[in-house]
């Protein structure tokens, strides 16, 4: 196979790996019954007029399965962090003692678990669509190589087969992550 075909396949693989990484990050923000600092990663705090990710303003500790302690680096940001946590869609009620913010995660109701599973399935489908779009763009590039005469038909067919296998592998990976997240959510 030609170098151009290898480049198309390599680029597609890298983009699909990135799509998997984004899916992992998205799944980490979905709350389960356990305390996980990653669930706060998408929360932005109004820090002196600038929207700043909370993980840049504080450190997180999980002393218990359903409790997170948040220690702001700048105590002046305490009220802004607390406000951002209250306004988030996580359904939490933070308390503060002046030094740290304590977040006790309430037990998830069955209804809330099902809601989160729907969110997880939507995120998984978005990831699958992203991976399929990457495949489509790579296939278009392969077709262009064939049309321009840079690669023979047999090489293109082999490359398309590899691309399909790559796509299938990445979609299965997303399904695996989803299955794991659903099991985590259903755990009482």
Predicted regions and their residues:
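Helix-adjacent hinge/juxtasegments
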Residues: 69-103
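Short, intrinsically disordered, mixed-charge
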Residues: 25, 83-91, 122-126, 136
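A positional/architectural concept
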Residues: 1-79
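Flexible hinge/switch segments at interdomain interfaces of large molecular machines
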Residues: 37, 47-64, 95-100, 107, ...
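Short, conserved catalytic or interaction motifs in soluble domains
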Residues: 32, 90, 147
């Amino acid at each position: 196979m030609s170098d151009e075909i290898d480049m198309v396949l390599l680029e597609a693989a890298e983009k699909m790996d990135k799509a998997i990484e984004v899916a992992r990050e998205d799944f980490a923000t979905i709350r389960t019954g356990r305390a996980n600092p990653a669930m706060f990663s998408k929360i932005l705090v109004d820090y002196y007029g600038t929207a700043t990710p909370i993980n840049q303003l504080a450190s997180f500790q999980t002393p218990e399965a359903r409790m997170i302690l948040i220690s702001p680096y700048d105590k002046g940001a305490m009220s802004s962090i607390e406000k951002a946590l209250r306004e988030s869609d996580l359904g939490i009620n933070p308390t503060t003692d002046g030094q740290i913010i304590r977040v006790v995660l309430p037990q998830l109701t069955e209804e809330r678990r099902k809601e989160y599973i729907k969110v997880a399935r939507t995120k998984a489908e978005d990831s699958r669509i992203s991976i399929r779009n990457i495949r489509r763009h790579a296939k278009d590039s392969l077709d262009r190589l064939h049309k321009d005469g840079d690669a023979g038909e047999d090489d293109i067919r082999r490359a398309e087969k590899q691309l399909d296998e790559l796509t299938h592998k990445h979609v299965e990976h997303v399904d695996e992550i989803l299955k794991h997240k659903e099991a985590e959510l259903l755990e009482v």
